[in-house]
Design a protein with these regions (language model features):
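Short glycine- and acidic-rich boundary segments immediately preceding or forming the N-terminal edge
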Residues: 1-30
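Short, motif-level signal for alpha-helix interfacial/capping segments enriched in acidic residues
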Residues: 14-19, 48-51, 184-194
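Short acidic-hydrophobic surface loop/beta-edge motif
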Residues: 18-24, 152-165, 217
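Core catalytic region of metal-dependent phosphoesterases/phosphodiesterases
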Residues: 21-22, 26-31, 36, 41-151
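Active-site-proximal beta-strand elements of phosphoester/diester hydrolases
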Residues: 31-41, 169-180
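Short, surface-exposed basic-aromatic patches at helix termini and helix-loop junctions that form
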Residues: 56, 132-145, 164-166, 193-198, ...
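Conserved beta-sheet core of the metallophosphoesterase superfamily
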Residues: 67, 171-223
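Short, structured patches in soluble enzyme cores that scaffold and shape functional sites
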Residues: 121, 159, 174-178
Length: 223
């Protein structure tokens, strides 16, 4: 199993670090994590049955769950120029749209609360913060009592064999993403650029463009 600790870093440009500690590492040991992005939970296009199956599997295997933004869709408020009547779920057709989607997300995620290691922001949440001055991710994280992360940051996975030593760590940098993905590259060029200025990250992840791409990079550092 694991423990988590969110570390605040001083400085306007500093990013938060979420530390995940794992001990008792032996041969054959394994710890799983479920990384999700762009769920758009309140959209009628969200495949909630599939989402629930993934979360159920994570809970059954003791996996940690990390969301890196756009858990909410939040596009159907009456002040949003993108809203359409066909893209709002029936249960949200009231005069408390924002409250309703937060309440529903809390109810949906409550069974998995103890497995959630962090909830991050996406462009849909930050748009609501700018327009309506309410923090969707913060509200959800507070009610679930789980760590609230930012639009980008670090997750450091720390492994320790026993109390006498045998320590190592893996650094993951996450960024929700921005802009388009590119027809051919599907967002991989942005990751290559990130690898150049974040050389200490062993893993780089991002979402936003709704593409599934995995790529192995080599970064050479001076000794």
């Amino acid at each position: 199993m694991y423990t988590i600790q969110r570390e605040e870093v001083d400085g306007a440009d500093a990013m938060p670090v979420l530390r995940v500690e794992m001990q008792g590492i032996t041969s054959g040991w394994a710890q799983r994590f479920l990384l999700v992005s762009d769920v758009h939970f309140d959209s009628p296009h969200c495949q909630r049955d599939m989402l629930r199956r993934h979360l159920d599997e994570a809970a059954a295997t003791g996996a940690g769950i990390l969301s890196i933004g756009d858990w909410f869709d939040a596009m159907q408020g009456k002040q949003d120029p993108r809203h359409t009547k066909s893209d709002i779920r029936p249960e949200y057709k009231g005069n408390n749209y924002i409250d309703a989607i937060v309440d529903d997300a809390v109810k949906f995620l409550e069974p998995y609360r103890e497995h959630i290691i962090g909830l991050g922001d996406g462009n849909h949440e930050t748009a609501i913060s700018k327009k309506l001055e309410t923090d969707l991710t913060g509200r959800l994280a507070r009610r679930l009592q789980v760590p609230r992360l930012g639009y980008s940051g670090f997750v450091q996975f720390r492994f320790q064999r026993n109390e006498h030593g045998g320590r190592t760590s893996v650094n993951m940098y996450y960024h929700h993403g921005s802009g388009g993905g590119g027809i051919m590259t599907k967002g991989t060029l942005r990751v290559v650029r990130q690898a150049a200025w974040i050389p200490d990250a062993h893993i780089l992840v991002s979402g936003h463009i709704h593409e599934l791409v995995r790529r192995k990079l080599q970064v050479y550092l001076p000794v």
